[in-house]
């Protein structure tokens, strides 16, 4: 198992393909598996690898919670497609004296008792919440306007990037291109969200992260279901 060399374009492509239908490296919540792979990626993936970039930006937002994420961090070769071998650690990046920056801002030290307790508490809370079936789920229908930089922006790629955003409580719907003038068209796309899981701030943050394609995002309509 593995992703090849995650410092190389080929390895990032394997990661992008792997995440095409997944939100996380393992399971349905951020875990130490995501931390292990994130730390092996030296910089944000390019915009055309939209699945990998979406995952990278999402996991980066958990910087302060790194130690408390569930699971046990394993070697890179324990994650990824079964038919690909991990080679990320075969180069100079194995050295502890390299200049790579730990984007999580901490060393691989032993987990403190407080961090362990906090992680176990959060995991227990998550499992408890998952086991309870809510009587009523509040949902909203949102219409988003996603604007490109200019008339040369690849709108098909822009829409692909937007739809690559996956989250529990988010369902993408229909879309269309709407002329705005000077040959420029904006993407108008519908989505349904569960209010306690997905907000417009989260959508805007993840959509505008595709900055090579997206200039801005606006909420055109918002209706409770």
Swiss-Prot record:
GO cellular component: cytoplasm; cytosol; eukaryotic translation elongation factor 1 complex
Cross-link (Glycyl lysine isopeptide (Lys-Gly) (interchain with G-Cter in SUMO2)): 147
One biological process term in Gene Ontology: response to ethanol
Listed SUPFAM superfamilies: eEF-1beta-like (SSF54984), GST C-terminal domain-like (SSF47616)
Modifications made to the protein after synthesis: Phosphorylation affects the GDP/GTP exchange rate.
Disulfide topology: none
Function: Catalytic subunit of the guanine nucleotide exchange factor (GEF) (eEF1B subcomplex) of the eukaryotic elongation factor 1 complex (eEF1). Stimulates the exchange of GDP for GTP on elongation factor 1A (eEF1A), probably by displacing GDP from the nucleotide binding pocket in eEF1A.
Name of the molecule in the record: Elongation factor 1-beta
Organism in which the protein naturally occurs: Homo sapiens (Human)
Upper lineage: Eukaryota, Metazoa, Chordata, Craniata, Vertebrata
Name of the coding gene: EEF1B2
């Amino acid at each position: 198992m593995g992703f090849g060399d995650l410092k190389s374009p080929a390895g990032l492509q394997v990661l992008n393909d792997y995440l095409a239908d997944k939100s996380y490296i393992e399971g349905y919540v951020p875990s130490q598996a995501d931390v292990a792979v994130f730390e092996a990626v030296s910089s944000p993936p390019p915009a055309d690898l939209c699945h990998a970039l979406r995952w990278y930006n999402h996991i980066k937002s958990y910087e302060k919670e790194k130690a408390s994420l569930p699971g046990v961090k394993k070697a890179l070769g324990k994650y990824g497609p079964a038919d690909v071998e991990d080679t990320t650690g075969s180069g100079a990046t194995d050295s502890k004296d390299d200049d790579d920056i730990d984007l999580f801002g901490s060393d691989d030290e032993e987990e403190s008792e407080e961090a362990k307790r906090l992680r176990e508490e959060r995991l227990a809370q998550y499992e408890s919440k998952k086991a309870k079936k809510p009587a009523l789920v509040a949902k909203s229908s949102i219409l988003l306007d996603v604007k490109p930089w200019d008339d040369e922006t690849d709108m098909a790629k822009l829409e692909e990037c937007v739809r690559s955003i996956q989250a529990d409580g988010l369902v993408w719907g229909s879309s269309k291109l709407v002329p705005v003038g000077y040959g420029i068209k904006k993407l108008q796309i519908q989505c349904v969200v569960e209010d306690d899981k997905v907000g417009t701030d989260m959508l805007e943050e993840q959509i505008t992260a595709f900055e090579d394609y997206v200039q801005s995002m606006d909420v055109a309509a918002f209706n409770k279901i």
